[in-house]
A protein has these predicted regions:
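N-terminal juxtamembrane segment and adjoining first transmembrane helix
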Residues: 1-69, 169-173
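Hydrophobic transmembrane alpha-helices
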Residues: 25, 50-51, 56-57, 70-100, ...
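Alpha-helical transmembrane segments of polytopic membrane proteins
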Residues: 43-45, 152-160
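Membrane-water interface at the C-terminal end of transmembrane alpha helices
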Residues: 105-118, 167-175
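Juxtamembrane or sensor-core-proximal signal-transducing alpha helices
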Residues: 158-185
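Conserved nucleotide-binding and Mg2+-coordinating catalytic segments in signaling enzymes
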Residues: 185-204, 223-235
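Cell-envelope/extracellular polymer assembly enzymes that use nucleotide-activated donors
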Residues: 219
Length: 235
């Protein structure tokens, strides 16, 4: 797979990821507006504008800017949600999702750098934020008071959303890994100069014939006709 094809694939992947985050924030806006949580409704509007603008980032060459910007946005958004409605609503659990997101993106998009220092640092920040939020629970009152039934409903919705995002993230990662494995297998089975299949590819295709009980008098002869002494060193 060429570098341009790989970059286009990564950009398409992040474009779809951005659509998922945009839909989630639209749902958050609807929920907060319905509950009268004006502060988070305003923050949701800002986040929605950010994700609309982020579509242009997914088409750029600097995809790391998009990944780390989203990571920071999730951190700030969920901390504010906990401050507004309390830890019982489970908004903080999305910080765990963000860790999956960071390391998945680090493999899929940022793997060329072969370093994940920023991802590790941000995950440490997420962990510290989680610990602080749980430690401060009970020492402050949420900015908005909600009925216990509403809180429980939000909590269930947030847990469901977290599980959905983790499953989606892992499925996307597995799909990408399978795609990369297929590309590597194809690269290993075909000669780079002639683009002809090699003996391993042929043997895999003819394996059923060789193992058949009624093979008959069929035989296979493979001859390597490459004269590497005459191949230019530029190859």
């Amino acid at each position: 797979m060429s570098s341009n094809d790989s970059t286009a694939k990564e950009q398409s992947f992040l474009f779809n990821v951005n659509k998922i985050f945009l839909v989630i924030h639209l749902l958050m806006l609807f929920m907060f507006s319905s509950l009268g949580v004006d502060l988070m409704a305003g923050v949701s509007l800002i986040s929605i504008c950010f994700y609309f603008l982020a579509f242009s980032l997914t088409k750029s060459e600097k995809l790391s800017i998009y990944v780390y910007s989203v990571a920071v946005e999730i951190l700030l958004y969920m901390i504010l949600a906990v401050v507004c409605l309390g830890i019982q609503c489970n908004f903080q659990l999305f910080l765990i999702d963000a860790m999956f997101f960071l390391f998945s993106m680090d493999y899929v998009v940022l793997r060329k750098k072969k370093k994940n220092h920023v991802a590790i640092l941000l995950c440490c920040v997420y962990a510290i934020a989680l610990i602080i939020l749980y430690m401060l629970d009970g020492f402050y009152a949420p900015l908005y008071k909600l009925d216990s039934v509403v809180i429980k409903s939000i909590s269930i919705a947030m847990i469901s959303g977290v599980v959905f995002l983790i499953i989606t993230c892992m499925m996307c990662l597995l799909h990408f890994m399978s795609s990369e494995e297929g590309a590597m297998e194809k690269q290993a089975q075909f000669d780079a100069l002639t683009e002809l299949p090699n003996r391993f590819y042929m043997m895999a295709k003819l394996k059923n014939l060789f193992e058949a009980e009624k093979q008959g008098e069929y035989f296979l002869a493979m001859i390597d006709i490459d004269d590497f002494k005459k191949i230019n060193d530029s190859f």
